Amino acid sequence: MSSAPEKQQPPHGGGGGGGGGGGAAMDPASSGPSKAKKTNAGIRRPEKPPYSYIALIVMAIQSSPTKRLTLSEIYQFLQSRFPFFRGSYQGWKNSVRHNLSLNECFIKLPKGLGRPGKGHYWTIDPASEFMFEEGSFRRRPRGFRRKCQALKPMYSMMNGLGFNHLPDTYGFQGSAGGLSCPPNSLALEGGLGMMNGHLPGNVDGMALPSHSVPHLPSNGGHSYMGGCGGAAAGEYPHHDSSVPASPLLPTGAGGVMEPHAVYSGSAAAWPPSASAALNSGASYIKQQPLSPCNPAANPLSGSLSTHSLEQPYLHQNSHNAPAELQGIPRYHSQSPSMCDRKEFVFSFNAMASSSMHSAGGGSYYHQQVTYQDIKPCVM
C-alpha cells in the first residue's frame, strides 16, 4: 500500500521539478526583453530636421546638377544629409512618396523607351520655382489664393475695358458741367453699374450711377443719356477744327449730319477736362437709332434741336461728312441691349483718348477712326 504512493511521488516530484525547471527557464527569457526595452528607451532617436518634406525634396532636387532625381536618389540624399533618416524608422519614405505624388510643384518626367519599370525622374515645376526662392519653402504665400480670387474679377474687367490706361491725373471733374442726368439715365441690362466702384478717383464727375436698370424697354427709343438736359447752345465756344464724324453720333432722318452755325469763342477758355468732355459728350448722348419708317416711336427726332445738335461741339461741315455715315443703318437691325453696350464701351474709350490727346490752347478731338468699321457682335 505504501509502495503505490511512493511510486506516484516521483512523477509528481519530477513534474514539480520540471515545473520548477520551466519556471527557472522562463525567468531569463522574461528578463531579456525587459532589459532590451530599457536599453532602447535609453537611446534617443535623432531629432527630425526642422523642414517640411516639401522643403527636403526641393533641397535634394536642387542639389543635383541636372535638377532631377529618382526616388532612390532622394532617399540617399536625405540619409546622407540628416541622421534622422538613417535610423530604424522607415515611415519617412512613405511621407516622401506622398508629397511627391500629391504636390503640384513636383513633376514626374516620362521615362525613355528603353527603361521599363520603376525609376522615374522627379523635378520641380518651373511655374512653382518662385515659391522656393531665397530659402522660402512654403507651398504658397499666406493668403495668396484668397487675394488672387478676390482680385481676379476686377482685373479682368479693368483689362477688358481698358481702364488700366487711365491715370488719376486725367480728371473728369468738369465733364458733367452742362449735363445733369437723372440716376436712371444709364439703362444697362447687366451689371455695368459696378464699374463705378472700380474707376479712378477723379471720374466721379461723370455721374455714373451705382445701380443699373435690370431690363431695357422693348419698345420706344432709349438711351444712356436720353434724359440729360443739354445746356444752351450759346454757352459753348466753337472749336477750331471740326469733330470727325462717327457712326456713333445721332443723325437726321436722311442719315447725314446737318451743318450748324459757327459760334465765336476760344477753346482755351475751357479746362482740358471740360473741353474733352464736350467732344466726347457727342458719343455719350447716343440715342438708340430706330427704323426711319417709324418716326413716332423715336423721340430723338423732336428733341435734337434742344439736346445735342444745337451744341457747337457737334458742329460738322458738310464737306467733312465721310461715307461711313451711310453705314449707320447697319446698327438698326441689332438688338437694343447689344448696340447700347457696345457703344458705351466705344464712347468711354473715345473719351479717354480725347483727354490724353488734348492740347493746351488748340482744338480738342477724339479719335473715332478705330471704331468706325467695327460692327457690334451678336452673341
Swiss-Prot record:
Q: Which Gene Ontology terms of cellular component type are present?
A: chromatin; nucleus; transcription regulator complex
Question: Is-annotated flag, keyword Ligase?
Answer: no
Q: Where is this region: Disordered?
A: 1-45
Tissue/organ expression? Expressed in lung and placenta.
Specify the DNA-binding region ranges. Answer: 47-138
Q: Does the keyword Transcription regulation apply?
A: yes
The highest taxon in the source lineage is Eukaryota
Please state where this protein is localized.
Answer: Nucleus
Keywords tagged on the record = Activator, Disease variant, DNA-binding, Nucleus, Transcription, Transcription regulation
| Biological process according to GO | animal organ morphogenesis; blood vessel development; cardiac left ventricle morphogenesis; cell-cell adhesion; cellular response to cytokine stimulus; detection of wounding; determination of left/right symmetry; digestive tract development
PROSITE patterns the UniProt entry points to: FORK_HEAD_1, FORK_HEAD_2, FORK_HEAD_3
Query: Which molecular-function annotations from GO does this UniProt entry contain?
Result: DNA binding; DNA-binding transcription activator activity, RNA polymerase II-specific; DNA-binding transcription factor activity, RNA polymerase II-specific; RNA polymerase II cis-regulatory region sequence-specific DNA binding; RNA polymerase II transcription regulatory region sequence-specific DNA binding; sequence-specific DNA binding
Question: Which Pfam families does the record cross-reference, listed alphabetically?
Answer: Forkhead
Chief location bin? nucleus
Q: Where is the composition biased (Gly residues)?
A: 12-24
Q: Summarize the protein's role.
A: Probable transcription activator for a number of lung-specific genes.
The domain comment in this protein's record states: Activation domains C-terminal of (and distinct from) the forkhead domains are necessary for transcriptional activation.
- Please name the disease the record associates with this protein: Alveolar capillary dysplasia with misalignment of pulmonary veins: A rare developmental disorder characterized by abnormal development of the capillary vascular system in the lungs. Histological features include failure of formation and ingrowth of alveolar capillaries, medial muscular thickening of small pulmonary arterioles with muscularization of the intraacinar arterioles, thickened alveolar walls, and anomalously situated pulmonary veins running alongside pulmonary arterioles and sharing the same adventitial sheath.
Record's protein name: Forkhead box protein F1
UniProt source species: Homo sapiens (Human)
